[in-house]
């Protein structure tokens, strides 16, 4: 048997531990009273007088003395007779008016306070005896106190200073009470609220106080309540925890005590200060492996008897910067006394942690004891205490242990709402047997919660949230902000079955129960579990009082078991029912709420409720049975009200509509994963589309023919051709660029419109617009017919490749333009050895074909042909002489340069004035490389192209090196200048022109003046490297250092560094293809 009992006890402990570890869930209210129902309750707003119709109450405190409720506010104290039953308004029967003097208000304004603060807010209202009451007010930041008679509220005596008895500001908290004829007060004692003090004054003996500016005693406290118990006076407050400073700024709840017979210390230690001041922490927390604390005390009750034990009940909240949460904890006075008899806490150094003081280091008599009591019974007064005891209590006022709550857990918690609980009032003798404890808790959202408390640790049931009441009246209470909805205080009037709920601007009188709401439905009445309500013998639900035991009643407060009861089939009252009263009427005591069983058409959210849970909810199973119709019909419109004379069929059970938390988490996680997968696929497909597009463009660009195969070299001036150059197909032969400069008899249109001639018929991409164009290439001088034969043969050899690959035929510039610096071309094609014509490369057929082309495309005079032929012969002879000199190792370079200059002079063309045609203007760098489709017939044969007999123009030096392609039959001599002429580190690299080319301007020796971007720049000769191809098979020329004077650059205006890539329309000259 003993073994069985031991096992049962162990099992009970294990179950209790498991229950303690789990965090308590918020209870759903069994009944809800919304604003539509609570707005009928009487409201107190203060009595307007004269021009104070808009006067705010500015509630400060209320106190019940016998059958009178005293309400203190700004400048006034009201009295309300509790025996009167108010209907819509609570009317005070008396009023005490105490306003600040004009001088005090002016001084308050001079201190920088707002005029609304410069009033007399009543902060202390403490009865001294049955006839007199001690009243203190802020008096425009100059606190003063008076005595008044309780019966008449008449001023009696003189004003006394309210310093250390009343705060300066109405927003500062304070407490006060009389014990043994002495006033104990706790407040701030200065204008800046920096000197918090617990003070004793009046009566016999000297005034005592806490040590000034000592954070170990009190640090930024908010005093909430003071009670007298035994030989001590207890103060409940919250403050900044000094033992928690190393970990951050936190607020802890405290209880402090002092002896009523404390006389202060000796002249050496603690003179005129408390010698018995001790404080301890109030621990309101949820137990478990890691405690969850509710550290901030908001309100606490007087000492009440809970199961015969003196107890105080308080409401606690989480830290202000934490998640909102509230709890109700009860503390027995015995546990508080036990903590004060325990160990002390100390901090040896400012940086060390707080530890417990060993018992052997605690002096005798024990600090905190009262003289002539207990361990200090041998001492008559506290002045006789030894200095060691006084010094110890001065530096060790904090106890090591915290006061635990009853049952080591809160009675009630509320953590899943956005508001905190702020006020509390307890009825510890509720029910017909007065054995239940009902707690009323106010919140900062204007709600009042009615809780049936679990007061016994052996009870199998937890606390039950009976009702949730929306007490704040929006219509009658003037709310300037959300703070005005906060419940400041609760006052229980059990004799008149009422609760007074105080807000800053009004006070609402609420009955403790609403038994009439359940009507004649027994199941609803029993399921409410309200200790104030019971099923009466008359067949209705009504309020149960201790005097009704003999009459008989039925209730089940512990469990609310209604399984043996049937469903309610109540005939609801209608508007034609004699005892029905209009909703909101001033004489209605049976008005209907939104959660009541009796539904009203004016409250659309009403739904049938299951009796055992009694929560309002909209359901689709709601049915109404009409009296005249025996058949049941579904009421499909829940928001249209209820017809007259209906019978409500309450469902016997309620299906759980809640979704399990695991299912909800799984669905959320699955939705997240699915969404992430879909998003990833979409991003991948979107990116892949662009990657494929970029690859296609890249392949098209790679397949394009490189333009480095061109045999011509182009010069780049003034930042031209900045855009990247793309290559063309490799099979375009080298001399094509020299042989495609055809001319024709066709002239440009007068308007110069060439939009249709810009794009190639094969749709070449516009990226090639930055390549040199024929507009940027000077007109090559006409060759002899024999020279053209060699080109014809070469063109005939490459005919097949020309048919397979796209060709471009840039158009020639307009021929008739005046000669000036602005017309000097910015890019020229330099001659090389392949442009010299040898008889070994020609035959008669090619000569005839070339001659035919020349006769068709270039009608020239015979004199010009002979002159060109003679000039070609002279240039060939001069070149042969030059080669001989170069091959001669004993030749003098200076002599060679002189010969070159003489050759240039001999090869000069006719004077500028006699030219029939002038060189073209400088083209735009964005001109397209593609010839317009209209310039060349689609099926035209491949032709050797010659140039018109236009006199040459001065050549410019090269700034850009073009890549070129060599094959077995042709070699080109190309040189480039990698840096600009005006670059200080640049070395001019140039190529010696062919001697047989006519039309070059003579190159003077010495320094030249070059035009760069329209500005004359002095250019000095610099050494250059050149390479020339031999005209014969005698090998290549030796690479020698040759100097050449820089050519004149065009006098053109500067061009932007970044120009658009798209080719612009350029007019074509008369030489078309």
Curated annotation (Swiss-Prot):
The modification Phosphoserine is found at residues 723, 734, 744, 931, 957, 983. GO terms for biological process: axon guidance; negative regulation of axon extension; negative regulation of smooth muscle cell migration; neural crest cell migration; positive regulation of cell migration; positive regulation of smooth muscle cell migration; semaphorin-plexin signaling pathway; smooth muscle cell migration. Residues 684-1073 are cytoplasmic. The chain crosses the membrane at residues 663-683. The modification Phosphothreonine is found at residue 773. Residues 1-20 form the signal peptide. InterPro entries: Plexin_repeat, PSI, Semap_dom, Semap_dom_sf, Semaphorin, WD40/YVTN_repeat-like_dom_sf. GO terms for molecular function: chemorepellent activity; receptor ligand activity; semaphorin receptor binding. Gene3D superfamilies: ligand-binding face of the semaphorins, domain 2 (3.30.1680.10), YVTN repeat-like/Quinoprotein amine dehydrogenase (2.130.10.10). Residues 744-775, 787-825, 839-874, 914-1005, 1021-1073 are annotated as: Disordered. Glycans are attached at residues 51, 283, 435, 461, 631. SUPFAM superfamilies: Plexin repeat (SSF103575), Sema domain (SSF101912). The keyword Nuclease does not apply. Residues 21-662 are extracellular. It comes from the Eukaryota. Belongs to the semaphorin family. Shows growth cone collapsing activity on dorsal root ganglion (DRG) neurons in vitro. May be a stop signal for the DRG neurons in their target areas, and possibly also for other neurons. May also be involved in the maintenance and remodeling of neuronal connections. Ligand of TREM2 with PLXNA1 as coreceptor in dendritic cells, plays a role in the generation of immune responses and skeletal homeostasis. This is Semaphorin-6D. It comes from Homo sapiens (Human). The lineage of its organism: Eukaryota, Metazoa, Chordata, Craniata, Vertebrata.
